[in-house]
Structures are given as structure tokens and as C-alpha cells.
């Protein structure tokens, strides 16, 4: 079994780690950074990932996709999706299956596809470091992700060419990294406020056993919402001062978003910051500039309710685990937003203790995923992880009631069966509708999917016995079966959301990804060939100017001809031709090298002679006769 990498697929940034010996290690990307922006852009037929996509976002807002994790596994009519539609500059569109997809460069992409591009970047980062192919990964998700979101994340891994050995909850991964090689027994809370989601998990750690007691959260609450509050504040202030609404200008919106994120980060360490955006827009009177002094107090006032929204899930998680706040011995902070002083203050106030700041909130989740990868491939042998399902699972029964089979915070993997019957006389088929959530009526919960059990022998209602079995695997993914006890007829399914990607769609996306990988590789080769050729043209022209007169007319003519031939193909898209002409010029320009060497050799003796002459000192002397 090869190396298993751990990937924190984040809303704002992503991170990859691997076990190196007995320690997990974060791997730096090609730019030398330990995290990679979770941003994809399409520009001039080229796909950009990470920092390169982020750099051009201001000039290409419509085709720059960020925070797609907030859309993954969601339906287009989801209120949370509608909320994001009014904020992001790119288009969120309805897919044929009803899911929320994104549109860029005149193409539609599923959130799983966009996530796959980020995962491919993480995979390449690991392969470059390890010098070997990587095919297996542990990928993290918010603890409060439902089945559809987990399935969609697993699909993203498959599209990226990865076998996803395990989907692991982010707070659990953080706890693994925190408690790794620590012997003390502790009850801890992991407070994870990231770029797009919030989770809190209560765990007991003892002798290498990490047992999740409960989890809670909000999959649509994170740093992006804090940025939006600042962005809207800037729009309001500018409108008040200039009478211009910037919310309809995609270019201005992208600049405002970047300024909001920057100001938010600065105010974690400073109490005031200046937001300066020259030439943000223009009207008949000329260009307009945005210049605002923004304070930490103003920021805290803008986002106070968002911070408060994280406290109720903490209260519920403690209640479900059967603990009081005073029972928690350590509170581990995870996610970039926990750097905000007001967030730390709220956590301290609720739990009654200073939160632990000894882990890097941007990296700890990836480190934990790498440790879990080590457990799965037997590199790490003294750890047992017991996670839970975040939401109750059940089916719709008579009257639209939600009947639970598995309660939230049940340790996984788990299996549970229950006997149901028919609602009508002589009913020969039943439809099993599977839901996930905490509401009493099925329609108020998340429909995960449905299937039919047919061929039930005709009988009065209430007589047939239909055994419904729920099986949740270690990834938190649901498998359901229904069996008629009389006939033995059985129907089994891995729940696929009412939307979601079909196997055929995933297969096509895998092929597209492989094709794109080949195209990306060819594009990279072309760019590298052009760069090498351009560099050679420059150096040849320079040396030809300096030493051209030392060449014979034949040699000089050969170099000039090869130089002209290379310059003529520089703008072409033919990598092989550019390489061929580069090699020809390299061979021809060897004559310049010989001329340079000869010229230097000839000047060397003369220089040495002059140096020696300088060392001779004329002196007066006289003979002294011996006495």
C-alpha cells in the first residue's frame, strides 16, 4: 500500500499532509505555501487553480469560482443557495437534476467537479514532494455535512483520480492531531469556525482511543459570511457618500470582497485599518475612490450575531454528550476565523476557560487526516477513532411523520432494523422515502432519496411485515435495504440524493479530468518551451552584439539564421517545433561561445604581463667593496 495523503478540502483554503515516519507533515505547494486558496478560474481557455486563480480574480470575476463547498450536495432551490446567489459574482445555475451548479467560461460545472480541480492540485502537490504517484486519500468534511454532501465530496475525490479511503469529520481530524502521541486522558471540545462552515464536537480521548460523544454545527456559517457583512457595509457607506450602488458591478464587488477579507484579517491584530480602493468606479463627474477607516469595534458590531450563532450548537453538543461546560478540560480552536479576538472571547465566556491555541488552525485538520491515513495503511497502529453520525436518519411513515431508525450522535459504523407494514389493503408495493434531520415531520427534513419494494403478496393492511435496515458506514454514508419477510423479496440501495451525480456522470467527469490533466501538461510544456526559447533569443542577441565581430562571416550567418528561425516560431502553439528550433540555435550559438573563450584567452596573457610589470620596482643601488 502506497502513501495515503490527508486533505483538508476547505471553503477558503485547502491543505494536504502526509505521514513522514511517525509524524504528520504539511506539504508546501509549488508556490512555497502551506495552504492553497480553494479558487478555480477559467481564463483564455486555461484553467487556473489556487493562488494563480486568486491573483486574477479582480479582472475576471465572472469566471472565478470560490467558496463552492457551500454549494456541494445542495439543491438549487435551497434557501442557502439563493442567499449566495445575490453575493457571488459568478453564476449559480440549476442543473438538470435540480442541483446547484456553477457557470464559467460558457460551461456548467458541478460543485464536485470544481472541488475535484482543487483536489487534483493537492494530489499533484503531494506527488511532487513524495516523488511518487498518489492514488489514495482521506478527505475531511464538516461534521454537520449530510449524506448528500458527503457523497458529493467522495465523488469529487473520484473525479480527481483518488480512491477516497475515508471521509472524516473536520473536528475529529483536528482532535486526532491535537491528541496524537499524548497519553493524558481528556474530555475536549473542538470549536471549528472555518471559511464557510461551523462545527463543534465533544470528544473523550484516552489511551489512543478518540471517541466522539456528540457533534453539532451549521454548514452555512463561516468566514465568507463575515466578509459579506464587511462588503455590504462598504457598499452602504460608499452609496451614502457618492450615491452610487456598487453591488451591481462585478469588478467592484470582487475588489470589495478582497478588501473585506484583508481588513478582517488585519483587525485580528490591529484595532483600526484603512480600506483604500482607488478608481473603484466612475460617473459623469469623473473617477471615484473608496477610502474608509474601519475599526475592530465596528467589525465586532457588524458580526456580533454571527458569533452568537455559534454558541447554540455548542450548548446542544454539550447537552447531547451529557456534559456541562465545566466538564470540558480543553477547548481546541480550529479554522482561520478563530484568530478573531471576539470569537476567542465568546468561546472563553461560554466554556469558562481560555481556549487552547497550541495548534495551527489552518493546518491541524489536514494533519489529522494524514494520521487517519496512517491508521488505514497500518503506518499508525495505536489509535482507534470512534466517530458519530451528525443527524438522525429515518423514513416517512403514514401521515408524513418522520420515524427515526438511527438517532443523531450514534457511533458509526452502525446498523439498525425496524419492522413496518402497509397502509392500505392489498398493497403490492411500498415506496421507502429516506430522510435525515431532527424535525418531526418528514417534509421538514432533508430527503436523501427513495426506492420501491415491489411484489409484496396481497394482504389486508398492517399484515405484511417489511423490515427496513439502515447501515451507516465509517464515512457516514447511508445504505438502506427493505425486505418483505413473507416473500423474501429485498431491495438494497446506497442512498443517492434526489439530485446528486449518477455513476455515468461521474465516469464522464473522470474522463474529462484525465483529458484536462493531459491538456494542462501539454500547455505547461508549451509555456516552458516558449520561456526557454525566449531566454535563449535574448542571450543570443546580447552575445552576438558583443562578440559578433569575432565570428567568421559563415558562423555569424548561421547563428543569425537560426536566431531568425526560432523567433519566427515563438508565437506558434507547436511545442516540438519550438524545441527543435531552440536546439538548432543552441548548436549554432556554440560558435559564439568559442569566440568568447578565445577572446578571453587572448586578453588573459596580456593582462597577466601587465600585472607582472606593475610588480617590478625600479631602485637605485651601489656596489659596496669588500673590506
Swiss-Prot record:
Residues 599-610 have a biased composition (Low complexity). The keyword Lipid metabolism does not apply. Induction: By stress conditions e.g. heat shock. It comes from the Bacteria. The keyword Hydrolase does not apply. Belongs to the heat shock protein 70 family. Acts as a chaperone. This is Chaperone protein DnaK.
Amino acid at each position: 500500500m502506497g502513501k495515503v495523503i490527508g486533505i483538508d478540502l476547505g471553503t477558503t483554503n485547502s491543505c494536504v499532509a502526509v505521514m513522514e515516519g511517525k509524524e504528520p507533515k504539511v506539504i508546501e505547494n509549488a508556490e512555497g505555501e502551506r495552504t492553497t486558496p480553494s479558487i478555480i478560474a477559467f481564463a483564455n481557455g486555461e484553467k487556473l487553480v489556487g493562488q494563480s486563480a486568486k491573483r486574477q480574480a479582480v479582472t475576471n470575476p465572472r469566471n472565478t469560482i470560490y467558496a463552492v463547498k457551500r454549494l456541494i450536495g445542495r439543491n438549487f432551490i435551497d434557501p442557502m443557495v439563493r442567499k449566495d446567489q445575490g453575493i457571488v459574482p459568478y453564476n449559480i445555475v440549476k442543473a438538470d437534476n435540480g442541483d446547484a451548479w456553477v457557470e464559467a467560461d460558457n460551461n456548467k460545472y458541478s460543485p464536485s467537479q470544481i472541488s475535484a480541480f482543487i483536489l487534483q492540485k493537492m494530489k499533484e502537490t503531494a506527488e511532487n514532494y513524495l516523488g511518487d504517484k498518489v492514488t489514495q486519500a482521506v478527505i475531511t468534511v464538516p461534521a454537520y455535512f449530510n449524506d448528500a454532501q458527503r457523497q458529493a465530496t467522495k465523488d469529487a475525490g473520484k473525479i480527481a483520480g483518488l480512491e477516497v479511503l475515508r471521509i472524516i469529520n473536520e473536528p475529529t481530524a483536528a482532535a486526532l492531531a491535537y491528541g496524537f502521541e499524548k497519553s493524558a486522558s481528556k474530555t475536549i471540545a473542538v470549536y471549528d469556525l472555518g471559511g464557510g462552515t461551523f462545527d463543534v464536537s465533544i470528544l473523550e480521548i484516552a489511551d489512543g482511543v478518540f471517541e466522539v460523544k456528540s457533534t453539532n454545527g451549521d454548514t452555512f456559517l463561516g468566514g465568507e459570511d463575515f466578509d459579506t457583512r464587511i462588503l455590504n457595509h462598504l457598499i452602504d457607506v460608499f452609496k451614502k457618500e457618492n450615491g452610487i450602488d456598487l453591488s451591481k458591478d462585478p469588478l467592484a464587488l470582487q475588489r470589495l470582497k478582497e478588501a473585506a477579507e484583508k481588513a478582517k484579517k488585519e483587525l485580528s491584530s490591529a484595532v483600526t485599518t484603512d480600506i483604500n480602493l482607488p478608481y473603484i468606479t466612475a460617473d459623469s463627474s469623473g473617477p471615484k475612490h473608496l477610502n474608509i477607516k474601519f475599526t475592530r469595534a465596528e467589525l465586532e458590531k457588524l458580526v456580533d450575531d454571527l458569533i452568537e450563532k455559534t454558541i447554540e450548537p455548542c450548548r446542544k453538543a454539550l447537552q447531547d454528550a451529557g456534559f456541562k461546560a465545566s466538564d470540558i478540560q480543553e477547548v481546541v480552536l480550529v479554522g482561520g476565523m478563530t484568530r478573531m479576538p471576539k470569537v476567542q472571547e465568546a468561546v472563553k465566556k461560554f466554556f469558562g476557560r481560555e481556549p487552547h491555541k497550541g495548534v495551527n488552525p489552518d493546518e491541524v485538520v489536514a494533519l489529522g487526516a494524514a494520521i487517519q491515513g496512517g491508521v488505514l495503511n497500518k503506518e499508525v497502529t495505536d489509535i482507534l477513532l470512534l466517530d458519530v453520525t451528525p443527524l438522525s436518519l429515518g423514513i416517512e411513515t403514514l401521515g408524513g411523520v418522520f420515524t427515526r431508525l438511527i438517532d443523531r450522535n450514534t457511533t458509526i459504523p452502525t446498523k439498525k432494523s425496524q419492522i413496518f407494514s402497509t397502509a392500505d389493503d392489498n398493497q403490492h408495493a411500498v415506496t421507502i422515502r429516506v430522510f435525515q434531520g431532527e424535525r418531526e415531520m418528514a417534509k421538514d427534513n432533508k430527503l436523501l432519496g427513495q426506492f420501491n419494494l415491489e411484489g409484496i403478496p396481497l394482504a389486508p393492511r398492517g399484515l405484511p411485515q417489511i423490515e427496513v435496515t439502515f447501515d451507516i458506514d465509517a464515512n457516514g454514508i447511508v445504505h438502506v435495504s427493505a425486505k418483505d419477510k413473507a416473500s423474501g423479496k429485498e431491495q438494497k440501495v446506497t442512498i443517492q440524493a434526489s439530485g446528486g451525480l449518477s455513476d455515468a456522470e461521474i465516469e464522464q467527469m473522470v474522463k474529462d479530468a484525465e483529458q484536462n490533466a493531459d491538456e494542462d501538461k501539454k500547455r505547461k510544456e508549451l509555456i516552458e518551451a516558449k520561456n526557454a526559447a525566449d531566454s535563449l533569443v535574448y542571450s543570443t542577441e546580447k552575445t552576438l552584439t558583443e562578440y559578433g565581430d569575432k565570428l567568421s562571416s559563415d558562423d555569424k550567418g548561421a547563428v543569425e539564421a537560426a536566431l531568425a528561425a526560432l523567433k519566427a516560431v515563438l508565437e506558434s502553439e507547436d511545442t516540438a517545433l519550438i524545441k527543435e528550433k531552440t536546439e538548432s540555435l543552441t548548436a549554432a550559438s556554440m560558435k559564439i561561445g568559442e569566440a568568447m573563450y578565445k577572446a578571453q584567452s587572448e586578453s588573459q596573457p596580456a593582462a597577466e604581463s601587465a600585472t607582472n610589470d606593475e610588480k617590478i620596482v625600479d631602485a637605485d643601488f651601489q656596489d659596496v667593496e669588500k673590506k
